[in-house]
């Protein structure tokens, strides 16, 4: 029988503190298998935590602190101490590690690995965003990504410049049924003919198009308009020069976003 139920049957409902947190049932001898009533003690959650902290039982402290709703930093520190206090780091034993890796690979191959559906990551990321600790929200990360994207756009290697990544992503979403084109709401606003073209791969957005100048291959009218007209080998493409930083041969979008009135050099004079 559950030790909490044993205590409740003998003493009634477990009381709550002023914050509405249910008190804890502590095993006096530290043996969770010994559920004798004389071995069970009802304590506040703070008292329970203090006992295990004094005993340097960091694993128990970590579990209790999660229930106490402490800050992520405090919980992380305790989790680290709990891991380091274990006599045997079982996951570092070569045989165990090899077995776990083989199991994960097998699950990935047969599609049963729990991280493949994305639901766990989605909830984890939403929680981190709510707490303000997601790496996308950190100034250092934002600056690094911005710098990398600027360089990629200038070199013409940014994923948005070629369309290959978007094309593969859209095809994947269509195949697994998660594309918004296939949602019930979108179906009400989209003709059956369009949906049929998407399913059989004949939609204009799925049609492969080759740049007339450099031979680069992309998909959809958008690729032709954005790449063909702006291709560096197109002699008739619009070329703009920034009057502040002397950068030349800029596309309209790059000029509008990073140069002209928005150029950093303009404010350094």
Curated annotation (Swiss-Prot):
One of its GO terms (biological process) is intron homing. It comes from the Viruses. Its EC number is 3.1.-.-. One of its GO terms (molecular function) is endonuclease activity. It holds the Pfam family HNH_3. It is an enzyme of class 3 (hydrolase). Keywords: Endonuclease, Hydrolase, Intron homing, Nuclease. This endonuclease is specific to the nrdB gene splice junction and is involved in intron homing. This is Intron-associated endonuclease 3.
